[in-house]
From Swiss-Prot:
Organism name: Pectobacterium atrosepticum (strain SCRI 1043 / ATCC BAA-672) (Erwinia carotovora subsp. atroseptica)
Family indicated by similarity: Belongs to the class I-like SAM-binding methyltransferase superfamily. Cx-SAM synthase family.
Species classification: Bacteria, Pseudomonadati, Pseudomonadota, Gammaproteobacteria, Enterobacterales
Coiled-coil spans in chain: none
Alphabetized SUPFAM superfamilies for the sequence: S-adenosyl-L-methionine-dependent methyltransferases (SSF53335)
Protein name per its UniProtKB record: Carboxy-S-adenosyl-L-methionine synthase
Catalytic activity from the UniProt record: prephenate + S-adenosyl-L-methionine = carboxy-S-adenosyl-L-methionine + 3-phenylpyruvate + H2O
InterPro entries the record matches: CmoA, Methyltransf_25, SAM-dependent_MTases_sf
Length: 247
C-alpha cells in the first residue's frame, strides 16, 4: 500500500510554493490517484500507445517522469528490439525513487533515468515523447520552445502525448468542472483544509492552459494532427502525431 497523503491535514503557517521534495515523493502515488481524475487510465493507455508507436532503433522519452509510472507502463508494452526509454525529472527525491521502481522489474527494454531540467535534454531519434502533467509547471514562455524541440526530435510518424489540467474560456463550464474536481477530491477523503492548502501552494507554480492554446501551440510547432484522446473533468490528455514523410 502506498503511504497515505496527510501532508496538508493540519494547518501550516507558512505554506510557500509547491516543490516536489522528499515529503511529496513519499506520498506521491496516493496523492496523484486521489487528486487527478482518470490518472490510472491515462497511465495504462500510455502503455497501449507505446505498443503502437514505439519503434526499434529509436528512443522514447518520459519528460517529467516523477516516480516512473508512465515509463513502467510503456516498458511493459514495448515489444520491439533496440528501443530505449529515457526518463527525466529535475527532482532528486523523485529520481531516486523512480530508479528504485525501475530496477524492481526486469525487462528487455532498457531505461535510463536522468536527473535534469527537461529544457536541457537533447531530444533526438524519438518515436514517442510523453509530457504527463509536466508542461503546466514550466514558465509559459518556455512551453512553445519545448514543444518545438520535441517536434524536431521526433521521427516522422512519432507521437507526443501531452497530459494536462485545463482551463476553459467558457467560465460556466470551467466553474462546473472545477467544482466536479473538488467533489472528486472530497470523495477521495481530502478535507477542505487539505484542498485549500494544497491549492494555495500550487497556484503560483502550476499555470494551466486551455485545450485551444495547447492545440495552437502544437500546430505552430509543426504537428499536423492533434486531438484530445482522454478527458475527465478539467484533466485530460492530447496526442500529436508528426506526419510521415511524403514519398
Amino acid at each position: 500500500m502506498p503511504n497515505r497523503d496527510m501532508l496538508f491535514s493540519v494547518p501550516i503557517a507558512n505554506l510557500g510554493d509547491w516543490t516536489f521534495d522528499e515529503r511529496v515523493a513519499d506520498v506521491f502515488p496516493d496523492m496523484i490517484q486521489r487528486s487527478v481524475p482518470g490518472y490510472s487510465n491515462i497511465i495504462s493507455m500510455i502503455g497501449m500507445l507505446a505498443e503502437r508507436f514505439a519503434r526499434s532503433n529509436s528512443l522514447v522519452y518520459d519528460l517529467g517522469c516523477s516516480l516512473g509510472a508512465a515509463t513502467l507502463s510503456m516498458r511493459r508494452n514495448i515489444h520491439v528490439p533496440d528501443c530505449k526509454i529515457i526518463a527525466v525529472d529535475n527532482s532528486p527525491a523523485m529520481v531516486k525513487r523512480c530508479r528504485g521502481h525501475i530496477d524492481a522489474f526486469r525487462s528487455e527494454t532498457p531505461v535510463e533515468v536522468i536527473e535534469a531540467d527537461i529544457l536541457n535534454i537533447d531530444i533526438k531519434n524519438a518515436s514517442m515523447v510523453v509530457l504527463n502533467f509536466t508542461l503546466q509547471f514550466l514558465e509559459p514562455s518556455q512551453r512553445q520552445v519545448l514543444i518545438e524541440r520535441i517536434y524536431q526530435g521526433l521521427n516522422p510518424g512519432g507521437v507526443l502525448v501531452l497530459s494536462e489540467k485545463f482551463n476553459f474560456a467558457d467560465k460556466d463550464v470551467g466553474e462546473l468542472l472545477f467544482n466536479m474536481h473538488l467533489d472528486f477530491k472530497r470523495a477521495n477523503g481530502y478535507s477542505e483544509l487539505e484542498i485549500s492548502q494544497k491549492r494555495s501552494m500550487l497556484e503560483n507554480v502550476m499555470l494551466t492552459d486551455s485545450v485551444e492554446t495547447h492545440k495552437a501551440r502544437l500546430a505552430d510547432a509543426g504537428f499536423e494532427h492533434s486531438e484530445i484522446w482522454f478527458q475527465c473533468f478539467n484533466f485530460g490528455s492530447l496526442l500529436a502525431v508528426k506526419a510521415e514523410e511524403k514519398a
